[in-house]
Design a protein with these regions (language model features):
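Substrate-binding/active-site clefts of carbohydrate-active enzymes
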Residues: 349, 396-571, 589-600, 604
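C-terminal motif of bacterial Sec signal peptides marking the signal peptidase cleavage site
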Residues: 20-22
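Short, surface-exposed alpha-helix to beta-strand junction/turn motifs within ectodomains of secreted
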Residues: 65-75, 183-205, 280-298
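The feature marks proteins involved in alpha-glucan
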Residues: 31, 35-61, 87-174, 217-271, ...
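Loop/helix patches that line or flank the sugar-binding groove of alpha-linked glycan CAZymes
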Residues: 698-866
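C-terminal beta-strand-rich structural cap/linker in extracellular carbohydrate-active enzymes
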Residues: 104, 880-901
């Protein structure tokens, strides 16, 4: 799971002046951060059409030069503001458009680059959650204290502080009960004398009383589609939102809509449909451009059934010109929190930086031959029928080609379409390399439209992309033209088509567990519906990114299922990897599996069976490893999960780079973990020597075995961290890497690797340290080092070993079993950190030996003749030795695989 980084349009450094643009380049609001004048406290002029937010922060150490405040608003870009020292401590000021209601902020400490969108190593002060301040009047001022999550106000410049007193939430629990949460929990509402509920016309709603739970009871039911306000004397009015009511059976029965949403382009008409049950009005805005200019065309949507809104217009005008197609659009949605402009969550493309959706005739984006596009398996001679037939290679789009010197499309989708590319040593790279390696699927790190990269900039930028902006839109920075929304769609399809033509399937990394910010398009359209909240109205943060999506709510579930099936059907994708899948409820993932496999029974579905923090979703409903049995039952090819048991067993805990595992440190104590993974998570303690995890899988198809992924250190970096980089340790380090890979490739389950593991990928910082979380590191850290492959290099030799492992696995059904029993895997011998076992598949029998010790060990072959296909340095489909019997010597730090003749 990657860290959340929100999109930044950052500063240009001109002498000592930083210019920050917090929405678009032409909407700076006068935010020119100039040097402090001696003896004067920093101020900032606020131009007409803007309002101002000032944040004071006090740090006991008095040191502010390694800190800043990350601020954002209106779902737009974020900006990092450095502190100006003042009598209170430090202060920042930001001007925002006058229609801004809330501003989000994070006080960041331990910044390596204060004032810039660099998040590596930062520590959030006060709380890990995103914080928000509600603006009032032309100027809002808050005071913060280091280590304190509260916001304060002051009448004397910060000498005395009072908790900021505001109505934190007015929650419609039912149509007649409004639960009020105050920022100061000690404040109780005891009388109606200073309380009013106002409807959209400002008329008072009759009130019955107040119960002992700070709940206001109305005399008449409220209409969820009307914009009610709660007024309490001496507080700013707040909109009433049905946060709790959203989860009631009454709401679900009245507003769960199962029809098509989004834009539908027909031969004669174009229809628009949006689900916004709490809206009092919705207006469609049409733009000629995806980024610049104002909308001159507006259409009022009509209220439809179950909370939907719709508009249908003629596709062509009187002159035969398109009214909508290839133009851009947003919705202005009026709810209890005001009128906010939002991008349609169902938008299929967007303008640069995703601020406006695009209306497309999708057929016009298809490359030539697209109607015949299909994943036909590797080289046409290998069938991927079960998950266990797959061999997955995880890659970031930019990493793949950014260092291919003769690529015309460095860092772009189209780099996957190029053939004949070679590195400086004449070794095939790019797509040709993948075909030679033999993997069956590429797993693309997030390639939907994410927030953290400025698509309008030609400057080098990098992010993994785990900060979703527009889920159904391809990321624009990987297209050759990010401004024209048609290009990214067409080029994404070309990428998929080229990989399919090479016999390689495409798996998309999807991140439906959270959005880049809670101030998202979802929340502008239906405030508080799409996210989980704690009992006191604070966003639940099981993602570790400030928010989490409420997948258990029917319309969130519908969006997730609709989104996945859209990508599958429109882009011919062959599978999906779910980030932090533990934050999705079981019902949602079951429905995803059913719909995806109804369209393509061979599609792969897998995810991280854990969360990124505490969540309000019940543990019994989480799609996590402990619930893998509840999720899949006895199903083969259901929803697979990453096997962290074998991962840590092979190389040591990912939470401690100095820890070593069975393969990297000959730790016998980790052997049970390894054997648990060898049998695909099946319950069989006789095989594991008594070890069992907290979960079990009835089928190896539902378990992803791996030792490296984009998260954490690379396998090679872990080995080098412990063993050093001296030439004297090179042979043993290479052996440990090969043994680790061999364990994954000879285990039952689905083999998975981070791209470049097979060429000893390293992520080394400029100072020589190893980067374990390179989500926003430089290209130099993240790129695949293709030029490391030469005919004599250890990287090339290691790649050849991986190639042989993959080929042997593909030629050996016993390693790809979809169903097993207690007799499938049998221990032959155990001798410390050396184990020999058999895998039996009918008449096919393998003897596999893992020797993690540094000395050779003798293993006696069972009766019959055996052929050796894999040893410590060689692997493939041609026998290394044939017709072997009796005792065999197994080299130290190696895997040997014998097949019965």
């Amino acid at each position: 799971m990657g860290k959340k980084i929100m999109w930044a349009v950052l500063s240009a450094l001109l002498s000592m002046i930083f210019v920050f643009a917090a929405c678009t380049p032409k909407d700076s609001g006068g935010n020119v951060d100039s040097p402090d004048k001696p003896g004067e406290e920093y101020t900032l002029e606020c131009p007409s059409g803007y309002r101002q937010i000032t944040i004071y922060w006090n740090r006991a150490s008095g040191v502010y030069d390694d800190c800043d405040v990350w601020m954002w608003y209106n779902g737009g870009s974020g900006v990092a503001l450095t502190f100006h020292e003042c009598e209170y401590g430090g202060k920042v000021i930001l001007n925002v458009p006058e229609d801004t209601i809330k501003v989000g902020y994070i006080v960041r400490t331990h910044c390596s680059s204060p004032g810039f969108a660099v998040w590596d190593g930062i520590v959030k002060d006060g709380t890990d959650a995103d914080r928000f301040v509600t603006l009032h009047g032309q100027s809002t001022v808050i005071y913060l204290k280091s280590g304190d999550a509260n916001a304060y106000e002051s009448n004397d410049g910060g000498k005395t502080l009072q908790l900021v007193r505001y109505i934190a939430l007015a929650d419609m629990v039912s149509t007649t009960r409004i639960k009020v949460t105050m920022s100061d929990a000690s404040v109780q509402i005891n009388t109606l004398s200073n309380v009013k509920i106002l409807d959209g016309e400002g008329k008072e709603v009759a009130l019955r009383g107040i119960n002992n739970k700070n709940e206001i009871v109305t005399s008449v039911p409220l209409d969820v589609s009307q914009p009610y306000k709660l007024h309490i004397d001496e507080y700013d009015d707040v909109g009433i939102v049905p946060s709790t009511y959203f989860s009631t059976a009454d709401f679900e029965a009245a507003y769960t809509y199962d029809g098509e949403l989004g834009v539908n382009v027909g031969a004669e008409e174009v229809s628009f449909k949006l689900w916004a049950p709490t809206a009092s009005s919705v207006v469609l805005n049409i733009y000629p451009d995806g980024y610049w200019g104002e909308s001159k065309t507006h259409y009022a949507l009509q209220k439809g059934e179950k909370g939907s809104w719709y508009y249908v217009g003629p596709r062509y005008d009187a002159n035969g010109k398109e009214n909508f197609v290839n133009k851009y659009y947003t919705y202005s949605v009026t709810t209890s929190v005001g009128t906010q402009e939002a991008v349609d969550p169902y938008a299929r493309s967007a303008g640069v930086n995703g601020g406006r959706g695009m209306i497309l005739d999708l057929d016009t984006t298809d490359p030539e031959g697209w109607t015949n596009d299909v994943f036909t398996n590797y080289a046409g001679d290998y069938e991927v029928n079960n998950y266990t037939d797959a061999n997955i290679w995880e890659i970031h789009v930019r990493d793949f080609s950014n260092m291919i010197e003769n690529s015309q499309y460095k860092g772009k989708y189209l780099a996957f379409t190029e053939t004949g590319l070679k590195n400086s040593a004449g070794i095939p790279v790019g797509l040709d390399y993948l075909k030679e390696l033999g993997i069956t699927h590429v797993h693309l790190l997030p390639s939907y439209d994410y927030a953290s990269v400025d698509e309008s900039s030609d400057e080098p930028q990098f992010n993994w992309g785990y900060d979703p902006l527009n889920y159904n839109v391809p990321e624009g920075s990987y297209a050759t033209d990010a401004e024209d929304g048609r290009v990214r769609v067409n080029e994404y399809k070309q990428m998929v088509q080229a990989l399919h033509n090479a016999g390689i399937g495409v798996i998309m990394d999807v991140v439906y567990n959270h959005t880049y910010s809670a101030d998202s398009n979802f929340n502008k359209i239906v405030p508080n519906y799409y996210y989980r909240y704690t009992a006191n109205g604070v966003l639940s943060n099981g993602s570790g990114c400030g928010n989490e999506m409420a997948s258990e709510r029917p319309m969130v579930r519908k969006f997730i299922v609709d989104s996945v099936t859209y990508w599958q059907s429109e882009y011919n994708l062959d599978g999906f990897r779910f980030d932090l899948m533990g934050l999705h409820d079981l019902t949602t993932m079951k429905e995803v599996e059913q719909k995806v496999h109804a369209y393509n029974p061979k599609a792969l579905i897998y995810g991280e069976g854990w969360t990124g923090g505490s969540t309000t979703l019940s543990g019994s409903e989480q799609s996590k490893l402990d619930n893998i049995g509840k999720l899949n039952g006895n199903k083969v090819n259901g929803v697979a999960m990453f096997n962290d048991v074998i991962r840590d067993g092979v190389k040591g805990s990912v939470f401690n780079i100095a820890d070593t595992g069975f393969a990297t440190g000959a730790k016998e104590g980790y052997l049970g973990n390894v054997l648990f993974g060898v049998q695909g998570g099946f319950y069989n303690t006789a095989f594991t020597g008594g070890y069992n995890a907290s979960w079990n899988s009835n089928s190896p198809t539902n378990v992803i075995n791996y030792v490296s992924a984009h998260d954490n250190n690379t396998l090679w970096d872990r080995i080098c961290y412990v063993d050093g980089t001296a030439e004297s340790t090179l042979a043993s380090r290479l052996a440990k890497n090969r043994l680790s890979a061999a364990i994954v490739q000879t285990s039952l389950g689905v083999p998975f690797m981070m791209a470049g593991e097979e060429m000893l990928r390293t992520k080394t910082n400029a100072d020589g340290t190893y980067n374990e979380n390179s989500y926003n590191a430089s290209d130099e850290v993240n790129n695949l080092k293709w030029n490391d492959l030469t005919s004599t290099s250890v990287q090339y030799q290691t790649m050849q070993y991986y190639k042989g492992l993959i080929a042997f696995r593909k030629a050996t059904p016993a390693l790809r079993l979809a169903e097993i029993n207690a007799n499938t895997c049998k221990i032959i011998s155990r001798n410390g950190a050396c184990v020999a076992f058999t895998i039996t598949n009918g008449n096919e029998q393998l003897l596999i030996v893992y020797n993690a010790t540094t000395s050779s060990k003798n293993v006696t072959l069972p009766s019959g003749n055996w052929n050796l296909y894999i040893n410590g340095t060689q692997a493939g489909t041609t026998a290394i030795k044939s017709n072997l019997t009796g005792s065999q010597s197994i080299d130290g730090i190696s895997c040997y695989v014998f097949k019965k003749a």
